[in-house]
Amino acid sequence: GPPKVAPGKXISASFGGEWL
């Protein structure tokens, strides 16, 4: 999916949605 901002993590990987 598109890049997301997770609380306390910042921008995630676009293909995972999780901080990598």
UniProtKB/Swiss-Prot annotation:
Name of the protein described by the UniProt record: Expansin-B
Positions in coiled-coil regions: none
Disordered: annotated segments: 1-20
Alphabetic keyword roster: Allergen, Cell wall, Cell wall biogenesis/degradation, Membrane, Secreted
UniProt membrane topology term: Peripheral membrane protein
Compartment list: Secreted, Cell wall; Membrane
Summary of the function given for this chain in its UniProt record: May aid fertilization by loosening the cell wall of the stigma and style, thereby facilitating penetration of the pollen tube. Acts selectively on grass cell walls, which are relatively poor in pectins and xyloglucans and rich in glucuronoarabinoxylans and (1-3),(1-4)-beta-D-glucans, when compared with cell walls of other angiosperms, including other monocots.
An example Gene Ontology biological process: cell wall organization
Superkingdom of the organism of origin: Eukaryota
Family: Belongs to the expansin family. Expansin B subfamily.
